[in-house]
Amino acid sequence: MKEFLAYIVKNLVDKPEEVHLKEVQGTNTIIYELTVAKGDIGKIIGKEGRTIKAIRTLLVSVASRDNVKVSLEIMEER
């Protein structure tokens, strides 16, 4: 699933080399922490959050096959 998410995000941004994805596993829960270049955050979120909502919907659909809850968080660069 991590590779699937990375593929989607890298094809949306201008700087795919700056896409970093961290997977944090819990019991029946996976949290993905996504970091992208500052200029690409708007492309990931999309107009009125539509793009990030669609990405999250895809993740939930894929994860439901394995009875796992999944969450995607966009992390701020420091």
From Swiss-Prot:
One Pfam family from the record: KH_KhpA-B
Cellular component GO terms held in the UniProt record: cytoplasm
Domain KH: 29-78
Main subcellular location: cytoplasm
Gene Ontology MF annotations: RNA binding
Keywords recorded for this protein, A-Z: Cytoplasm, RNA-binding
Function description: A probable RNA-binding protein.
Designated name of the protein: RNA-binding protein KhpA
